[in-house]
Amino acid sequence: GMLPVSIGPSQSSILVPVGGVSSFKLCHGVLLHSAPRTAMSGTLWIVKTTLPGEMNEAEVGMWCQSIIESNLAACVDMKRVNSVFRWEGEIQNASEWDIQMKTSESSKNELISKIKSEHPYDVPQIVWWSVVSTVEYYNWVQG
């Protein structure tokens, strides 16, 4: 098939054939072949959620520390953000804590389950994606 790809600020797009083609990135019309994964890198997972802005820094720190103590993530980043979202038909604007966790493939599903079971929101944001890191960082996250 064909995949439309944006080619810059004009939002013009071109059609790129997909299927049976090596992976690539298209950047302003320049085709860049991605390097194959080698022993120089490893695949990890970033799991992201948010916590209520009403929680103070110590409370958020304790929540994050419990993730580390359970050995489900190697590192947890936390920062304040402002979020705009629709909840129960109303547009809301709220201060929240953005929480980003680095974890391994073997711990990802258990980490997601822990977040679901202990999260203060009825419908928490829980999203995740794989990332490639240096082999040294990969080994550190693996434990």
Please describe what each predicted stretch is.
Residues 1-143:
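Positively charged, small/polar-rich N-terminal and surface patches that mediate targeting and assembly
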